[in-house]
């Protein structure tokens, strides 16, 4: 039997999403498999991540799937996209999004200016691998550990301020997913600082290299502040646009654009 699923395609600075309202899905769907199928760029719609959302009394619940069908704990760009979608559909400008237990406070100033307060970050190193393993890995790829930091923004990130060539970023991003280093994988941020701006590329676990990463921007901004490399406010620069970042009372606030690409119907065999 073929069923029809309404979807929205959006992107945040090139980081693209297929977004589906959970009310449009029956309980019979294998959501992990559906995410993989719709994310496939040749036989599906194509995206970096598949987003489900559901409206509750005073917040919207967001569930994130990677292209490999695994779940993600946070996505800043998807949050901005969802906030814009809700604004377009309802006119609401102040929107609360819940991802698991994390509350994200969103404000849509206008269609191209959406801010997200992602809250505080943690530099607790309990989830890091042993220092011996890290040193061995760092020496192999000439990474300066004094310029490397782990940060949890709701999902785990490693931020590397040592300059690496694009081909080396791919290798390092892939190999840091090794179970003996990070049991559940890790998002890897390659950051270069110039004039209080961070030029950033990100290897997202479960996805690979992406054109932009909102949670990576937040984690890298927080890491840059901790190292003293930048001050607040600052700018995160991606290939297809920038995010403005600031810190207020220990909270990280991200601001930038989100783009509506298409609305459509996906036909799914069950």
Swiss-Prot record:
Record EC number: 5.1.1.7
Keywords carried by this UniProt record: Amino-acid biosynthesis, Cytoplasm, Isomerase, Lysine biosynthesis
Organism listed in the record: Rickettsia rickettsii (strain Sheila Smith)
Function comment: Catalyzes the stereoinversion of LL-2,6-diaminopimelate (L,L-DAP) to meso-diaminopimelate (meso-DAP), a precursor of L-lysine and an essential component of the bacterial peptidoglycan.
Residues making up the signal peptide according to the UniProt record: none
Residues involved in substrate binding: 15, 49, 66, 76-77, 155, 187, 204-205, 214-215
Catalytic reaction(s) noted: (2S,6S)-2,6-diaminopimelate = meso-2,6-diaminopimelate
Protein name as catalogued: Diaminopimelate epimerase
HAMAP family, per the entry: DAP_epimerase
Major site of localization recorded for this protein: cytoplasm
Biological classification of the source: Bacteria, Pseudomonadati, Pseudomonadota, Alphaproteobacteria, Rickettsiales
SUPFAM superfamilies per the UniProt record, alphabetical: Diaminopimelate epimerase-like
């Amino acid at each position: 039997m073929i069923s029809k699923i309404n979807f929205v395609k959006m992107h945040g600075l090139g980081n693209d999403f297929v977004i589906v309202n959970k009310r449009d899905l029956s309980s019979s769907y294998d959501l992990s498999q559906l995410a993989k199928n719709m994310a496939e760029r040749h036989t599906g719609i194509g995206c970096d991540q598949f987003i489900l959302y559901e409206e509750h009394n005073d917040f919207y619940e967001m569930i994130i799937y990677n292209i490999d069908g695994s779940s993600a704990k946070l996505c800043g760009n998807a949050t901005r996209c969802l906030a814009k979608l809700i604004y377009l559909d309802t006119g609401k400008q102040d929107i609360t999004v819940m991802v698991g237990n994390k509350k994200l406070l969103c404000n849509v100033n206008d269609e191209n200016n959406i801010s997200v307060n992602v809250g505080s970050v943690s530099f607790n190193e309990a989830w890091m691998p042993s220092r011996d393993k890290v040193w061995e890995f760092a020496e192999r790829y000439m990474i300066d550990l004094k310029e490397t930091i782990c940060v949890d923004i709701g999902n785990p990130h490693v931020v590397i301020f040592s300059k690496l060539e694009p081909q080396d970023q791919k290798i390092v991003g892939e190999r840091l997913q090794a179970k003996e280093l990070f049991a559940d994988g890790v998002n890897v941020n390659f950051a270069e600082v110039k004039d209080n701006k961070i030029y950033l590329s990100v290897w997202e676990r479960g996805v690979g290299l992406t054109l932009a990463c909102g949670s990576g921007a937040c984690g890298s901004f927080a890491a840059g502040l901790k190292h003293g490399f930048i001050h607040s406010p600052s700018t995160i620069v991606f290939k297809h646009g920038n995010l403005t970042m600031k810190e207020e009372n220990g909270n990280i606030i991200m601001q930038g654009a989100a783009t509506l690409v298409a609305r459509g119907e996906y036909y799914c065999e069950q």
